[in-house]
Amino acid sequence: MFKDKEIWLDDEKRKKQLDKTADRAEATFFGFQRVARDRKADRVLQHFNSVAQHYDFMNTLLSFGIHHLWKRSAIRMLKLTPGDHLLDVCGGTGDLAILAARHLGPEGGVVVYDINRAMIEAGLHKVADKDIEDRIRYVQGDAENISFPDRRFDAAMVGFGIRNVTNVKK
């Protein structure tokens, strides 16, 4: 079936092969649609501008609510400690940031980093009535060109947004 099945049995070889293939591709996918690599970011931006106000509801509906369990599990896996600083890449409406902020205490903090202003704004109300408002900052920026220096954060995470990044290696 495969010419060189050894590639698929070795994690490093497999990743190199997949990266090489992705680097040569002129197209990528946005959902099930094939789009030019240089147009994907625009498509992602347009899509999330149009769904931002309903994104959280749609996420709950389409996952039958299980995304709440996935998110709590992801935060536990980070093993955050009070005082840590976390970067939430493609943080959108801030669900993961809110969960994380509860673990960080008053000395810690989370930066929600998302390219889409509409998604950020759609989530601002979720922290307004909680005691974590001063632990979460919002920065509009591109996940492929993060504008923070190395070692600025104790941890970084990306949730569902990873599927919308064209050049994951960046």
What are these regions (language model features)?
Residues L69, D95, R117-A118, R163-T166:
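Short alpha-helical
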Residues D154-V168:
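A short SAM/SAH-binding and catalytic strip from SAM-dependent methyltransferases
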Residues E144-A156:
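A short acidic, Gly/Pro-enriched loop at the edge of an enzyme's catalytic core
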Residues H85-I146:
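Class I SAM-dependent methyltransferase SAM/SAH-binding core
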